């Protein structure tokens, strides 16, 4: 959620902007961590300030190991990666801008426009060209060489038997 900045949000959190982005984690373990933090500090608005676990232009990690592979060389002994298991949905998070009269989606993810309208009871605001993290063309560009093959015939024994039992 992108919200109007309060006086509690320091410049190093907001980059000096008049808004702040708040992540609402889907992980029950992370929600428990945040709830415990609020209890320990006796402050219902306690939060953890943290960057994304991927470099600019990279795909968001879906496991703790992916995060370590992506940013491990930048971690210090004071840094912590909470391994709560793999992400349930392997796509970028939805980003909703709530700084105007009506919410608007900056980046689609698991949460749909209909979900936002249902949760807020409001119709979404207009769309505009917005540059949000995770929408660059490079995010879903393969890093490996890709060979496009129009047609190939493989002998039966070359096709893994598990393909017929694959779940999509």
Enumerate the language-model features and the residues they cover.
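Active-site-adjacent structural elements in enzyme catalytic cores
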Residues: 1-165
